[in-house]
Amino acid sequence: MAAVGRLGSAAIRSFLWRRTALLSSVRCLSKDEMPGPYPRTPEEWAAAAKKYGMRVEDYQPYPDDGTGYGDYPMLPEEGAESQDPWVDWDDNWHRRNYGDVPHVHSDAYTRQRVNPSQKYVVPWKKMIAALVGFLGFNGIMLYFGEMYKHMVPVAPKQYPFNNLYLEKGGDPDKAPEEEIKNYEFPKS
Amino acid sequence: MGALISHNYKAYFGEVDYTPDPESMPSFDPNYGFQEPREERVMVATQKEMADARVPMQLRDYCAHKYMAWMMCRRDHMPNLWACKHERHEWDQCEYDDWVHRMKEWERERRLLKRKQLKKSLEGEEE
Amino acid sequence: MLELWGVLSLTSLGVMVIFLFSKIKSSFAESVKYAGYMNAVLLSILLMSDESEMLFLKWEWVKLGGYSLMISFRFDLYTCCFFVVGLYVTWNILMFSFYYMSTDPRIDLFCKYLGLFLIAMLLLVSAESLFQLLIGWEGVGIMSYLLISWWYARSDANTAALQAIFYNRVGDIGLLIMLMWSLVTLGDWSFTGLYALDFVNTFFLLGVVLAAAGKSAQLGLHPWLPAAMEGPTPVSSLLHSSTMVVAGVFLLIRFSPIILNHKEIQLMVFFLGTMTTLFSAICALAQNDMKKVVAFSTASQLGLMVTVVAGAGAPQLAFLHICMHAFFKAMLFMCSGGFIHGLQNEQDVRKMGGLHSAAPITSVCFFIGSAALMGVPFLAGFFSKDPIIEIININNLNSWAVGLVLIATSFTAAYSVRLLYFSVGGVSRMLVLQPMNEEYGNLIGPLQRLAYSSVIAGVVFIYFLSPNQISCLSLPLSLKLAAVFVTLVGGLIAWDVVNLLHREESVTNIPELAFEAQVGFYPLIMHKLIPKVWLNMGEMYQMQVMDRGWTELALPQGLGGNYKIMADNVVNAQTSLIKMYIAVMVMMGGLILGIMICL
């Protein structure tokens, strides 16, 4: 799928507008506000970093596999919910300052929506380990339990009429192979 | 519960060799080891009777006639079900005997398997 | 004669429906009560007769080719018992909601919602065809949604309601699978037809299992049940303990003859039930929210019912447990509702304690309900739970599953004792000057009625139900006492642990408790992992590749650009020079000529 995306992206770049895939949702933006093409040379890299107000060491665009966002920087996924509420933000509701580069999905990471950087009491990996461990342990033990069944020291229940051959939906025209007979124990 | 746990232990660790398999239970000839042939278990109710009385499938066993008697008594004395405690007891006793019969079958199978085991080991020693 | 009684029963229900539209809310409660009495009479008439089931109405609604959709009501033992239990419990809960919701401005609407739910539930249990079952099923689902989000201004309640309806939709897929498969393959939706055909189909049965798991909150689809506790307490009491959540088990009971013919599905349902009963019991152990403990114990008991339907193959016992469970669990919820209301909406058990002096009658009812839930001998729960444990013990079943059921049973006692210790017993830890008062007729009355029924219902039902399977008559004493024994052990352990953990000098925060307190991390992980996976896939393939890739290139967004390029070329060619046109003409003619020669 990435290959298809890359093909489409390359096609767009080569013979359409020479722009990256970031098109439709920002159609209203002017050309200067659009992210530029993926930076190839170190100079372009530095220029892109400067454009977004970042240091070159911090700047890292999305990989250019056809589904990237041009030179837009790949920022850490932080929801507004987990930002410090006591900081004097320029925008207190969205908890961001003027000139901050927003995450490319920042519309999904507002305070009413999802928070990808949620802090849990128990670490995430530990939680998964606990749940998978619980279910997996029980699953394995149920498998072994199926091998070693709970054994009650009685014979299977005996039923008359060939073990209820007809009642259990047997074919009346075709008699069962051998007739099952049950015997009493002698009275002592 | 303790009895069952110890039995389970025996079935899988202590006496693995001669614990019967409930899936293929009567593996010996029914008359093997008896002085005279055993009598066949008597089924009193017929298939048609049971079908007419709509006896549940699990209860169409050798006590079905007593179950049917109980149910008929219930129907006749419906609001006063204490009137049927005699029939209820009869059926319960029959089911109890059936359970004991199942236990006996199990024990017979177990002892025969043990005996077979013993015989085999004796033959091995003679050789 | 029998038909007459059936018609009377349906008429009483019809009158109940009419009273649903009355302006006076208590008259609806009265009508529910009298409908309950009428149906109790019907039940005894049915038991007296020789019939095991009756079909009413038999009205042909739609006729499509060879298929005809019949509307009829199936009145068998299960339906009649459930009618009586459901109407009795609903009547009490309606009276209780007059107390609990008395300050709510829309209490009339609330009672109408409860009534609509009741009608949907009765449709569900008396359904004769899968289609009617679907109507009742979706009816209870939507009423559950509306009632959980009753306090719609609270975002928690909204979230819980959405969770409930989403998880229920997953289960409904199973029901739709059943409907479609049976219509396409068998051309019949009626239960009579499905029973008579005696088919065994994995696809259909997986639908049954999925539907039951969704509605009855089995492991995997369970998080909505504890979340649904955000709704008002009468809702939790009616929908999420006694009636709606058992609809899944009821479906399994209806289809148990088919399930028991399929070994793999039977095993699957058995494992699902045992794992649910253990998981929910573990989660209930460390909850501090009073209603959540009761909710998890409900889920645990539902797991026990599912276990016994499939594992031991005794659907009648499961049904008995449904009836018993309805009485005492509805009462437990009402008691906790009374406590919560008296303590000004305080649900945290750590802030309760010593309520036996503040609210003695509620406390006694709470104790009776917990004892019945634990299976203390000769209360209602004992008569269903003890045979369940016994029948699981005397069958050659999966040994680990048997152990899990026993552990879960002991946990039942553990969390019940813990809850009792925290709320009713001990020293009072509530805020001072709480106007704790239980002198309301609409609180005490329903509680007492349900308490009496929790005591005697077991005897009555055992007395009237004719057994469908062999009762265990010759157990060794130790095995006979197994259920009581594990209950006792669980209770003692709970007592010990509570004393250990909640003294002043003790360590109260044990990290190992996080698994129990955070309900096994299941909702946290699943509610994050699955949406995240789908979100990433959506971003990758739908947004970047399709919307911003190929749509830009060739599809609507790209068409404009492509046409613009072509149009630009055409415009560029329009130079008004005759030589240019002639050149183009010659070129085209040469091309056509060349093609013709080549061909």
Curated annotation (Swiss-Prot), chain C:
GO terms for biological process: ATP synthesis coupled electron transport; electron transport coupled proton transport. It is found in: Mitochondrion inner membrane. It catalyses: a ubiquinone + NADH + 5 H(+)(in) = a ubiquinol + NAD(+) + 4 H(+)(out). One of its GO terms (molecular function) is NADH dehydrogenase (ubiquinone) activity. InterPro entries: NADH_DH_su5_C (IPR010934), ND/Mrp_TM (IPR001750), NU5C-like (IPR003945), Proton_antipo_N (IPR001516). It comes from the Eukaryota. The chain crosses the membrane at residues 1-21, 28-48, 81-101, 115-135, 171-191, 193-213, 233-253, 265-285, 302-322, 323-343, 363-383, 398-420, 455-475, 481-501, 510-530, 577-597. PANTHER family: NADH-UBIQUINONE OXIDOREDUCTASE CHAIN 5. This is NADH-ubiquinone oxidoreductase chain 5. The lineage of its organism: Eukaryota, Metazoa, Chordata, Cephalochordata, Leptocardii.
